[in-house]
Amino acid sequence: MTVQEIKGKKLVKGIAPNVEPEALLNDKRKVFLFGSPSYTNIGDQAIAYAEEKFIKNHFPYYEYIEIMDYATDEGIELVKEIIREDDIVCFTGGGNLGNLYLDIEEDRRKVFSAFKDYKSISLPQSVYFEDTEEGQKEKKKTQDAYHQNTNLTIAARETQTLDVVKETFNSNVIFTPDMVLSLDIVPRELERDGVLFILRADKEKVTDEDFISQMKQWAEKTTYTERTDTVLDTVDTIDYADREKHFMEMLDRIGSSKLVITDRLHAMIFSIITKTPCLVFGNSYGKAKHSYRDWLESLNFIEYTDKNDVEELERMIDRLLQAEPNDVDLSKDFQPLIDFFAS
């Protein structure tokens, strides 16, 4: 089999955008990452960015090959032709294992059942199946697909998900933080001004708009405010080549703010990277809350709250703004993932 034959038959756009085609056929042990996002959620783009850095930093002797989400079917067919016994199949991490984002879940089922004879991992995820007839029906489909693969490991990124995975699946399970927390990025020194509200506009949103208006009015007494989201509406897609640019732009936007108020897990994590004081509210099933409680509670410039009394929140924000930002070292918490890839 030659690269030309692969290209001629099945090397479509979205398969291996991060390497030269020849890399598909070299003698290195390969790590195939499926589900690499092309949609405009910068949190998920940052996860994919961090996954690549993690594998390349810890295992430079592996060939890391991404398959974009829009090329899943073609990617499965091509990888079947070139995969070897000791290669590893991954599906990208995030907060989409469950029935809320079925297109992604259906791809994950396909991948894990297609490669049931190979070492496989769902990278750090939050898991949520709604307690509805539809949610439970989809959970059964996911169980049926995953249980075909006795070589599957599921990485849970909070204790809430760890419990769900243990109850729901027969798979091996490991516990690590979100992949973006593995990044070692020195933030740019930027002039800071204003309060940046980074808020959901999707099916996970639970923060009340009247409450948001109250918070904005409070902030506007002393500074200007801006509202945005970590899902970009200025572009339709983000391919591999543009991922880093959009991620760094989001970090700069957060790093030039005096304060971030958010209900987004990754806006909180981006605030940690840029040392930006951040007040965090919840989503519909506790992703940010449980990640904060499990890994980040020792940080003095980040605070999670369920409160909605503006006066009380003012005092909380004052504390955050006065803090000299500290650090948290989570490197040891990624050891289970290093051990997985090392074996």
UniProtKB/Swiss-Prot annotation:
Recorded family membership: Belongs to the polysaccharide pyruvyl transferase family.
Annotated EC: 2.-.-.-
Taxonomy, superkingdom: Bacteria
Any matching Pfam family: PS_pyruv_trans
Keyword terms of this UniProt record: Stress response, Transferase
Entry protein name: General stress protein 30
Induction field: By heat shock, salt stress, oxidative stress, glucose limitation and oxygen limitation.
Encoding gene (name): yxaB
GO terms for MF: transferase activity
